[in-house]
């Protein structure tokens, strides 16, 4: 199987998981994905193995696999890692007065104006990748590359918020400006604030989702239990006192 074909399927699935098009708990099968991507099952199988290795898939009863659940602690860890990489990158980049391509900011604002979540995530990844490249240390980008699938997923949760994306690109622009001006401490402070706020908002949104999901599940369970109890009543009790009389 051509490696680029496996990588294309893998990248498409990472993007779908990151944007929420494939949500936690969704079941996917090799056959379904092969039809969707118009490829044989072999590249799909290899891509699924990579996703399982990355912790994005888990076993499912019966056929196929499930998109792994999102856990607040896991996303905190992802943002701790990204925060450390960003802090080092902006320090090195600002020391060199590196210039971040302004079209990256424009692309992000454009995706925001179109409310296009996949493009917003792509633009965010592109901006942070540019920061890592501007640092002059190729190992920063390499380290981030090992975790992009989780970082994209974390971004998907954060950028899904109603108000979160409105200030993301203002913060990115301010970071790029401080880096270009050689203001190392200001660039670091802006980057740390950006990462911390994103992490806190992301975890809060995820916890709200979990509470809503648990509430809906509990309501459904209560309803099913009530219906089961009602079915177990004697016919006279189910009809009510007036009907039974």
In which residue ranges do the predicted regions lie?
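Short linear motifs at protein or domain termini
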Residues: 1-95, 203-223, 228-245
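Short helix-capping and inter-helix turn/linker motifs at the boundaries of alpha-helical repeat units
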Residues: 4, 118, 163-166
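Mobile beta-alpha loop/short-helix "lid" or hinge segments that flank ligand
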Residues: 52-58, 147-149, 164-166
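Acidic active-site catalytic centers that drive phospho-/nucleotidyl reactions
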Residues: 86, 124, 183
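Conserved amphipathic alpha-helical segments that form helical-bundle/coiled-coil interaction surfaces
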Residues: 95, 99-157, 168-178, 186-196
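C-terminal all-alpha effector/ligand-binding and dimerization domain
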Residues: 104-110, 157-245
